[in-house]
Amino acid sequence: MLEQMGIAAKAASWQLALLSSREKNQVLEKIADYLEAQTDDILRANAEDLAEARANGLSEAMLDRLALTPARLSGIANDVRQVCNLADPVGQVIDGGLLDSGLRIERRRVPLGVIGVIYEARPNVTVDVASLCLKTGNAAILRGGKETWRTNAATVKVIQQALQECGLPAAAVQAIESPDRALVGEMLKMDKYIDMLIPRGGAGLHKLCREQSTIPVITGGIGVCHIFVDETAEIAPALKIIVNAKTQRPSTCNTVETLLVHRNIADTFLPALSKQMAESGVTLHAAPSALPALQNGPAKVEPVKAEQYDDEYLSLDLNVKVVADMDEAIAHIREHGTQHSDAILTRTLRNANRFINEVDSSAVYVNASTRFTDGGQFGLGAEVAVSTQKLHARGPMGLEALTTYKWIGFGDDTIRA
């Protein structure tokens, strides 16, 4: 089955690579329109997935990732339209010039070919990936989690209808609907057809892909994110940022999981934090350095366990640790962070610059929420993933991350001397 999907996807990718920006945008507009026109069908499939997920005891964080609503689906359709408005990187000349030999050389952006994506309970990923791949002239083979197979199937059906309406092969976007886990292992060996593989899920999935894939893999998306409250931070705006970073949507990978507080501000800051977290329903997991200032406050407090510093909670839980100085804060982030998103709250430019230079994450913030690490927020449009590695892409992966380049030489009957 996968062999035939790979053959069809590769053939579709050659056709997609030749489309003009106008033609690709027409497809995307059609997809957005069809998503809205067939909202009821997609939501019906999603409701069935949700019912089965609840019966199987999925956590509230996972259920939130799985759920679609009319508003969320409308937002997904609008995200597709936003991709239409983005500049098409395909065909862009990156650099070049005339060589001494008389050869004119240029480096030009081209599609990667076929993108494989393995993801868990995030039905929006289906549309995000499809829209970005189509905009960049790539075909896509998608393998969503078993929790969302009905939603994914309904969504891909809509996308394929739009493709065929525009005279393009349905195989440009395909989904592996079978829940058979053995197919994941088979997909990881499809380097003959798939040019890049992107896993979006937990640490286990990323480890599996790194160890078993014969396809180049982009890993990331696991976010043990930190905020360091410097001694010069202002309490009121700092609390506002922390509430946003923890509670706006706790199930996302750019949510803060550990708060590091400079000891010189801790006695004033931690009681205010406890009050704010109690109002927000956040459970604090306190280090011994933070526990005395928090245990009599209104927020629910538990002693932190050492292994929790490595946890991506995806829930209303927050580790809190008082640190002696920035050295200790940076050391903690280096030991426990996942190079996703980390922030410093400070009013000192020197401290801000030091944090920027010494914290090796794909996104580093000064006086801002970690929740901004997102393709849409960065002006990239919908993202295909957030990469925490350094090759071939880093941070939110927008359109350019789904392209490669080729060297083109123009001669006048030119030969090498």
UniProtKB/Swiss-Prot annotation:
GO MF, one annotated term: glutamate-5-semialdehyde dehydrogenase activity
Q: Which CDD domains match?
A: ALDH_F18-19_ProA-GPR (cd07079)
**Broad enzyme group:** oxidoreductase
The catalytic activity of this protein is classed by the Enzyme Commission as 1.2.1.41
Pathway(s) the chain acts in: Amino-acid biosynthesis; L-proline biosynthesis; L-glutamate 5-semialdehyde from L-glutamate: step 2/2
The record, for InterPro entries, names: Ald_DH/histidinol_DH, Ald_DH_C, Ald_DH_N, Aldehyde_DH_dom, G-glutamylP_reductase_CS, Glu-5-SA_DH, GPR_dom
Q: Which residues form a coiled coil?
A: none
Indicate where this protein is primarily found. cytoplasm
Q: SUPFAM superfamilies, alphabetically?
A: ALDH-like
Q: Please give a single GO biological process term from the UniProt record.
A: L-proline biosynthetic process
Where it sits in the cell: the answer is:
Cytoplasm
Which Gene Ontology terms of cellular component type are present?
cytoplasm
Note whether Repressor occurs among the keywords: no
Q: Cytoplasm as a keyword? A: yes
- Cite the entry's keywords alphabetically: Amino-acid biosynthesis, Cytoplasm, NADP, Oxidoreductase, Proline biosynthesis
Question: Pfam families, from UniProt?
Answer: Aldedh
Q: Which reaction does it catalyse?
A: L-glutamate 5-semialdehyde + phosphate + NADP(+) = L-glutamyl 5-phosphate + NADPH + H(+)
Family to which this protein belongs: Belongs to the gamma-glutamyl phosphate reductase family.
Described purpose of this protein according to its UniProt entry: Catalyzes the NADPH-dependent reduction of L-glutamate 5-phosphate into L-glutamate 5-semialdehyde and phosphate. The product spontaneously undergoes cyclization to form 1-pyrroline-5-carboxylate.
What PANTHER family would the database entry show? DELTA-1-PYRROLINE-5-CARBOXYLATE SYNTHASE, GLUTAMATE SEMIALDEHYDE DEHYDROGENASE
Q: What is this protein called?
A: Gamma-glutamyl phosphate reductase
